C-alpha cells in the first residue's frame, strides 16, 4: 500500500480501509464507513476551509516533517478554540503539550478528545481504544472522522491529504469542458 500511496494511485477510501482492516467491531466499522463516504462526498479530509487554513498555518510554523507531527497538527487544527491554545505552545520542533494541559481542560468535549488523540501521536500512550470511538454520545461524528483520518496522515504524511483532496478524473474533465464552453 505504501508504494501506491507514494504514487498517488489509490483512493483515500482504500487507505482508510487498509489502515483499519484489523478492526472487526461492527459499530466501529459502521461509523468508519460513514466517515469514508463523507470524505468521498467532500473530496477532503478537512472538516472545513477553516480547518484546512489552520493546518496549513501550523505546517508553516514547524520545521519537522515527521508524520506523527503532521497528524498532531491535523488533529489540533480541527477545532478553532483548541487551535488558539495550540498556537501559544507551538514551537519549531513540535507542540509543548504540558504547557497547554490546563487551558484544554476548560474547552468543550470535542476539543478535549482531539487533544487526547493528538497527544497519543506524541507520546504513543493509548488512553482509549477504538471501542471508545464507537460511543456516539461521547465522541461526535466529526471528531470520530478527524481521529480516523489522522491515522493515514500519521502513517503516510501529507501524501494521504493530497490523495484525499484529489478530484476524480471524470470531474476534472467535466470542469475543463465547462470552462471551454464558456470561452
Per-segment meaning from a language model:
Residues 1-106, 111, 122-170, 175:
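Extended, charge-biased low-complexity segments
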Residues 178-183:
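Non-Sec secretion/translocation targeting segments of pathogen effectors
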Amino acid at each position: 500500500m505504501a508504494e501506491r500511496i507514494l504514487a498517488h494511485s489509490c483512493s483515500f477510501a482504500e487507505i482508510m480501509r487498509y489502515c483499519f482492516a484489523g478492526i472487526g467491531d461492527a459499530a466501529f466499522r459502521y461509523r468508519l464507513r460513514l466517515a469514508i463516504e463523507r470524505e468521498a462526498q467532500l473530496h477532503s479530509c478537512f472538516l472545513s476551509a477553516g480547518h484546512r487554513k489552520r493546518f496549513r498555518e501550523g505546517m508553516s510554523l514547524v520545521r519537522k516533517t515527521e508524520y506523527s507531527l503532521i497528524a498532531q497538527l491535523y488533529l489540533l487544527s480541527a477545532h478553532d478554540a483548541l487551535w488558539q491554545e495550540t498556537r501559544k505552545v507551538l514551537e519549531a520542533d513540535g507542540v509543548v503539550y504540558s504547557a497547554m494541559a490546563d487551558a484544554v481542560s476548560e474547552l468543550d468535549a470535542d476539543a478535549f478528545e482531539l487533544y487526547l488523540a493528538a497527544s497519543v501521536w506524541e507520546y504513543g500512550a493509548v488512553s482509549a481504544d477504538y471501542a471508545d470511538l464507537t460511543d456516539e454520545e461521547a465522541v461526535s461524528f466529526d471528531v470520530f472522522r478527524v481521529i480516523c483520518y489522522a491515522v493515514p496522515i500519521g502513517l503516510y504524511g501529507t501524501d494521504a491529504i493530497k490523495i484525499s483532496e484529489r478530484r476524480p478524473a471524470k470531474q476534472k474533465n467535466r470542469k475543463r469542458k465547462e470552462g471551454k464552453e464558456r470561452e
